[in-house]
């Protein structure tokens, strides 16, 4: 490792060295006061809608798992399910990032959605706590691959000076879908 690593001064409590890159200065809004374009980036909407789809579906898992396991008398298995689900997301992220960088988004999205859909299908057939637990890795890997790929594509779809608004657009759709989906699918 080099002595001149860019993080070295930051870790030592010193400011990082100045870079020669020019920063993009945000453009002045053409609207006075409040306008929806301050919060929503239209170019990011297709990917935000994909995030909405996966978030809505994920919210069904959040609602269904505890209820179903409790009805089987195996409520304690819910903790194991969500621990495995989260572990698969954590494990998948660095691997998914490298594959995304090398091969592009399509392989990540198709594989992620395929695993997530397979997990949902198996979950729909599951009649034992162990079968439900078996779906956690499939759902976790699928969600852990597809969700950040959609987020990255939402951000990349807009001009760099709108990256923050693109991020907000994506997470607005994701948050709405998880919140609304939990209510709608629990009915």
Where are these regions (language model features)?
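Juxtamembrane intracellular "pre-TM" segments in multi-pass secondary transporters
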Residues: 4-50
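Loop-to-transmembrane helix entry/capping segments in MFS-fold secondary transporters
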Residues: 75-76, 160-170
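Helix-loop junctions at membrane interfaces in 12-TM secondary transporters
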Residues: 124-135
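Transmembrane alpha-helical segments of major facilitator superfamily
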Residues: 80-89, 174
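Intracellular juxtamembrane helix-capping segments at the cytosolic ends
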Residues: 145-158
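Structural signature of the two symmetry-related core transmembrane helices
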Residues: 107-122
């Amino acid at each position: 490792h080099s002595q001149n690593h860019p993080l070295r001064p930051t870790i030592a409590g010193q400011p990082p060295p100045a870079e020669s890159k020019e920063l993009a200065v945000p453009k002045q809004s053409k609207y006075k006061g409040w306008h929806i374009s301050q919060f929503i980036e239209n170019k990011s909407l297709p990917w935000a809608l994909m995030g909405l789809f996966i978030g809505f579906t994920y919210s069904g898992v959040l609602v269904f798992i505890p209820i179903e396991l409790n009805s089987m008398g195996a409520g304690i298995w819910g903790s194991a399910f969500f621990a495995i689900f989260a572990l698969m997301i954590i494990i998948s992220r660095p691997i998914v990032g490298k594959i995304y960088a090398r091969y592009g988004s399509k392989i990540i999205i198709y594989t992620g959605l395929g695993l997530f859909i397979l997990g949902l299908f198996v979950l729909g057939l599951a009649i034992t706590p162990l079968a439900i637990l078996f779906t956690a890795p499939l759902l976790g890997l699928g969600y852990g691959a597809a969700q950040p790929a959609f987020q990255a594509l939402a951000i990349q779809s807009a001009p760099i000076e709108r990256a923050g608004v693109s991020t907000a657009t994506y997470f607005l759709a994701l948050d709405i879908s998880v919140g609304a989906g939990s209510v709608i699918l629990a009915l």
